[in-house]
Amino acid sequence: MKVILCEDTDWLLSEEAFSIYASCMYHPTFEDYKKRMKDYLSDPSVKVFIYEDWGEKTGMMVLRLSNADAEIMGIAISENVRLKGIGKQLIKSVAESLKLECVRAQTDDDSIGFYRKCGFSEERIVVEYPDGSTVRYNCTLYK
């Protein structure tokens, strides 16, 4: 197992990467994914980390970095290897290697349990959208 900084733009814009990352986007098409990833790649404060096991990429985490703080823009694990601690290991490994003091994320009811298991504290908020409101959670992990 290894966690690596991925700078392979071709792979990050591939259908293989999309197949992993799509689960943390709201009903994306491949074109939606590529647009978002290109936006991430154009921002020098954003880095993409990959979880790789025996040469197979099974996890991705997109972080926006600011000094010793980071915001998780998205984290996703291949469906066939979920619930094995890969997401938690991805966060832990990157936080340790970058010596992060604080990691933040915003999530929904579907994923709040994951962040709780990783040790994040949470603040429940209601976000208004044109088609209604939804519950979200601001999650924070301090070292």
Per-range role (PLM):
Residues 77, 83-96:
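Conserved acetyl-CoA-binding loop-helix of GNAT-fold acetyltransferases
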Residues 87-91, 111, 127-135:
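Short glycine/proline-centered loop/turn elements that form peptide/ligand docking sites
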Residues 115, 120:
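Conserved active-site tyrosine of GNAT-family acetyltransferases
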